[in-house]
Amino acid sequence: MGIQTSPVLLASLGVGLVTLLGLAVGSYLVRRSRRPQVTLLDPNEKYLLRLLDKTTVSHNTKRFRFALPTAHHTLGLPVGKHIYLSTRIDGSLVIRPYTPVTSDEDQGYVDLVIKVYLKGVHPKFPEGGKMSQYLDSLKVGDVVEFRGPSGLLTYTGKGHFNIQPNKKSPPEPRVAKKLGMIAGGTGITPMLQLIRAILKVPEDPTQCFLLFANQTEKDIILREDLEELQARYPNRFKLWFTLDHPPKDWAYSKGFVTADMIREHLPAPGDDVLVLLCGPPPMVQLACHPNLDKLGYSQKMRFTY
């Protein structure tokens, strides 16, 4: 004699299954809605972002905060990449690269720390910086064109890099246990992006060594951020400064980047070493590369932003 199933029991089971299915679908949709959306979907497209805030960082540097499309958007910038800002000034197209000081953990906004080069201040650049002065003139609510991600280097974690020799070449994998960095002025922003990405992962064994060059002590941007990271991760991050015009009680190096500075504060040449460079072209070409040559760092051990 077969087992007869009660219609009431079947109905109850059906309702239960529908309820469970509904809960599963609802949970999936909630998780999906909470997943951050990416702003930079196409590196060839321009995205208009609105200025939210502008604050003074130092005597010649400001932090610009731009709103992303929604509070749940991230910029969508891989570590190692940068963005371009573009605008027309006096009828001419002006494009400049920048690396945000925020990351894709920050939702709803992106921050840029930029030195404002004013007209008539520097004798070599009497007109000042076109883009930086334009940004400084913006009012809250004004929009700027963003484009990206751009760049030849990507950090994928735990010492692994993908580096393109040029824009048309495929990326080549590179592994570094020790990361040397030489930055000048606002060239610190891509370094800080990378340092933060490495240090926030306890399992990342990469050691970071930064030599940061500036003209005067008041020109050192993001110093508090760097010194906080050094204090928090003393075994993973080493920080050293050099100034062209240091104060009397200066505890770090003086003058342009030299071979001795590199030897003392960056990892020695080796297959597990990568040295990153970002700063004014004269510093990179006339001070950094010749001294790296002198100390035996091969071209494969270097990358210039």
UniProtKB/Swiss-Prot annotation:
FAD binds at residues 136-166, 175-210. Widely expressed. GO terms for cellular component: cytosol; endoplasmic reticulum membrane; extracellular exosome; membrane; mitochondrion; plasma membrane; platelet alpha granule membrane. Keywords: FAD, Flavoprotein, Lipid biosynthesis, Lipid metabolism, Membrane, NAD, Oxidoreductase, Steroid biosynthesis, Steroid metabolism, Sterol biosynthesis, Sterol metabolism, Transmembrane, Transmembrane helix. Belongs to the flavoprotein pyridine nucleotide cytochrome reductase family. This is NADH-cytochrome b5 reductase 1. It holds the Pfam family FAD_binding_6. One of its GO terms (molecular function) is cytochrome-b5 reductase activity, acting on NAD(P)H. PANTHER family: NADH-CYTOCHROME B5 REDUCTASE, NADH-CYTOCHROME B5 REDUCTASE 1. It is a single-pass membrane protein. The chain crosses the membrane at residues 8-28. Its EC number is 1.6.2.2. It is found in: Membrane. It catalyses: 2 Fe(III)-[cytochrome b5] + NADH = 2 Fe(II)-[cytochrome b5] + NAD(+) + H(+). It is an enzyme of class 1 (oxidoreductase). GO terms for biological process: bicarbonate transport; sterol biosynthetic process. Residues 44-156 form the FAD-binding FR-type domain. Its cofactor is FAD. The gene is CYB5R1. InterPro entries: CBR-like, Cbr1-like_FAD-bd_dom, FAD-bd_FR_type, Flavoprot_Pyr_Nucl_cyt_Rdtase, FNR_nucleotide-bd, OxRdtase_FAD/NAD-bd, Riboflavin_synthase-like_b-brl. NADH-cytochrome b5 reductases are involved in desaturation and elongation of fatty acids, cholesterol biosynthesis, drug metabolism, and, in erythrocyte, methemoglobin reduction.
